[in-house]
Amino acid sequence: MRKIISKALSQETKNELHKLEARWANFRFGNPSKKIRVIGVTGTKGKTTVCNMIASVLDAAGKKNAMETTINTKIDQEYTAHTNKSRWVTTPPPEVLQGFLNKAVQAGCEYAILEVTSQALDQNRVHGIKFDTVVFTNLSHDHLDYHKTKENYLLAKLKLFENNPKARFVINEDDANWNRFYSLPASEKFLYSVKKPIEHGAVARKILSSPNGSTFTAAFDDGQAIVELKLPGIFNVQNALAAFCVGLALGLDPEKIKLGLENVSLVAGRMESIRVSKNQDFAVIVDYAHNPDSLKNVYETVREGMKNTGGKLISVLGATGRRDKTKRPIMGALAGYYADLVIFTNEDPYDEDPSSIIEEVAEGIFKGAVKKRQWVLNRNYWKVLDRAQAIHKAIKEAGKNDVVLITGKGAEEVMAVDIDKFVPFSDRDVVKSELIARFGREG
């Protein structure tokens, strides 16, 4: 009945109902955001990693904190992984969200860190929450199935800043939209960049990247710190700068900020390398990249790490059903440009025909083709409907110094095969099984 009523209502009406729900939840739990300092992180990509980095920085500084992200919930030192895709909403409904904040308060946490999506902002899910610090990471092609235009998408992100004029702002100056956020009133504004000097915030200099991580100098108003990240890729340097600026905004010791960033290990399903045996002579990486910009960043990071190895990049990818269809051929084109072998496969089709989704992604491969490579079906690219079989095919094709890159699902442990139907599926588990079958288990 609730679904029938929901379909009959306009989005505007539903948003007003969400606002009422948020007010009630806020009242029920005693307005918890006034008893804890809330940090909100929004942007197309990097939100989960930035949240985990901020939590690590606060831990290093001895500040009790809680966190709610796509992949995990944290209350002080107790972590809970999110494995059910029906639970995998970046920003939960108001009742759940206010309950989480209340638990954080009851646990004695001083800070709470929240991932905040554009949909959550548009739908008033965070209405009534008082944010102490808000972060903008970036804006790129995604979620146009919901917002229709990139301007609407941007306007939704801006709400987090517009609604919190007394908060501290942390903004990525390398993003083309940075000034739309910076122009809004705030108690204090911090910028970060890997490209240009900034007036107040942090900039990365002397960046050295490898497949195992990145080292850079974070230069800020009162000094500098050499940070050795365990996470690879320039995009993770940007993520680290965002967390560094949050630490500065909160008045933390820069040495504690540095320590917290250096303590961050790979986030599950984010550039996660899987190895089962010392005999394994190629790499397998699982990553959540599910939009063009994230996919491009991952491809570039992997390619950078493969320089002079002579190995092939074998890409396994698809696209989610019921989401922005315009990005599907773009992702296929990126695969055509960066990869040597490509396997297009199923990825959370919901109620769409998975074969049709695969066709829409695969048609882009020719647009991304480089002159030295001609794409031929069943010779250097394949369409494999069964995702487990696609992973099997990729690992079978892999040889010495190759990299198998599996994108789209990250650490998720279910696949959405209809609107409300989820079946168990884990890229990571399938990869481990395939590698054990080929190399045996170490130990």
Model region roles, listed by residue range:
Residues M1-N15, C245-P254, L259-G269, S273-G443:
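ATP-dependent carboxylate-amine ligase
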Residues R2-E173, N177-E188, F220, L241, ...:
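Phosphate-binding loop of NTP-binding sites
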Residues E21, C51, W178, G213, ...:
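A general structural signal for well-ordered alpha-helical segments in protein cores
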Residues K34-I36, A107, F131-V284, A369-L377, ...:
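Acidic, Mg2+-coordinating active-site environments of NTP-dependent enzymes
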Residues T44, T70, N172, V194, ...:
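Cofactor-binding loop segments of dinucleotide-utilizing enzymes, especially the Rossmann-like FAD-
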Residues T48, N239, D287-N291:
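Short, conserved phosphate/pyrophosphate- and ester-handling motifs at nucleotide-, phospho-/glycolipid
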Residues Q77-K85, L229, A416-D420:
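Short acidic, glycine/proline-rich loop/turn micro-motifs
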Residues T91-Q98, L154, V237-A240, P292, ...:
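Amphipathic alpha-helical transducer elements in NTP-driven molecular machines
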